[in-house]
Each structure stands twice: as structure tokens, then as C-alpha cells.
């Protein structure tokens, strides 16, 4: 039997399933993940995000989220506007990494955003995440936008560099 991989915009039911998986996977310290789940569901319900999921034989194996409207509590200058979407939550379940599934999901997401009128996408990365920076550069994120900080629900503050690419 041949494997079936599909990409789609997640339903709230899909999101519940995926977030429960992430919380269980981070069971040693689920606090941030529980707060992020609540925010992700609210952002989707309020039309601020488009969550994209890749499913292999019905199992959610990878994801990415596009913020298409800024959160009123966040500084989205240069990151989100009428023609710019902010991409985040790039995750692939460990057994499926390096097999091209996320690349297919990414291409699907970019094409969907393009058809919705978006012309530019942005990403954020911590300066010390060298491998992620290389991956983003490979995907074309080479235009430096700005540096800022992000505060996690537990109070941890991280530095973030933001990059953009035209689509």
C-alpha cells in the first residue's frame, strides 16, 4: 500500500489532536505548551492565523502556522500586514524529519498564501539557532527585518532575529 500524504488547513479538531500530542511530548514541562495551545485555538477561531498541517495516512506529522492578522498585544511592525504573513510553529514529528514532508507542506502553504494575495512572508529565529538560520536561508529568507525579544508564558525571554522573503 502506498503512503498518502496530504496538506491542508487544519480544523479545530485537527488542532486539538496536534496540541495534545505536543503537550504529551513535552510532559516534563508542559506549562508553556498548554498556554500556547489556548492561544493557537483562539487565534484560529478569531481569524488571525491559518494553521497548515501535513498528514501521512491520516496522522498529523508536520505543521506550520501563518499569522495573517497581528495579535493586538504583539509588536508586528514589519512582520504582518495586508500583504505580509508571519510564519511560525514549523514542526515535524521526529520519525518523519528529513524525508521531505515539511518541504511539501511549506510549498503548499506558500502557494495558498500567494493565492490569498500575500506577497511577502516573514520568520523569526533565535540568533544561536545556526541550523534553523541555514534552513530559513535555504528557503529564501535572506532579507533581515529586525531584532526583537519574545517572552514565553513562563517568563523566559529570548532574542529573535526576523527575516523575510517575497513570494
Question: What is each stretch, according to the model?
Answer:
Residues 12-13, 23-89, 93-94, 106-108, ...:
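Acetyl-CoA-dependent GNAT
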Residues 93-95, 99, 128:
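Active-site acidic-Proline motif in GNAT/NAT acetyltransferases
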Residues 98-106:
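Glycine-rich acyl-CoA binding loop
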Residues 103, 128-145:
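Conserved active-site alpha-helix within GNAT-family acetyltransferase domains
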Residues 113-125:
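Conserved GNAT acetyl-CoA-binding A-motif
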Residues 123-133, 150-154:
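Conserved beta-strand-loop-alpha-helix junction that forms the acyl-donor binding cleft
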Amino acid at each position: 500500500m502506498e503512503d498518502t500524504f496530504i496538506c491542508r488547513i487544519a480544523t479545530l479538531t485537527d488542532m486539538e489532536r496536534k496540541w495534545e500530542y505536543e503537550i504529551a511530548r513535552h510532559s516534563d514541562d508542559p506549562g508553556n505548551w498548554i498556554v500556547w495551545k489556548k492561544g493557537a485555538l483562539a487565534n484560529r477561531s478569531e481569524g488571525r492565523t491559518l494553521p497548515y498541517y501535513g498528514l501521512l495516512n491520516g496522522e498529523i506529522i508536520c505543521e506550520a502556522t501563518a499569522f495573517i492578522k497581528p495579535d493586538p498585544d504583539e509588536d508586528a511592525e514589519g512582520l504582518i500586514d495586508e500583504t505580509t504573513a508571519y510564519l511560525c510553529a514549523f514542526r515535524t514529528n521526529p520519525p518523519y524529519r528529513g524525508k521531505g514532508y515539511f518541504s511539501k507542506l511549506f510549498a503548499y502553504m506558500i502557494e495558498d498564501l500567494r493565492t490569498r494575495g500575500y506577497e511577502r512572508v516573514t520568520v523569526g529565529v533565535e540568533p544561536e539557532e545556526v541550523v534553523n538560520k541555514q534552513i530559513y536561508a535555504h528557503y529564501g529568507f535572506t532579507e533581515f527585518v529586525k531584532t526583537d525579544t519574545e517572552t514565553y508564558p513562563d517568563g523566559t525571554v529570548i532574542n529573535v532575529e526576523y527575516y523575510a522573503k517575497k513570494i
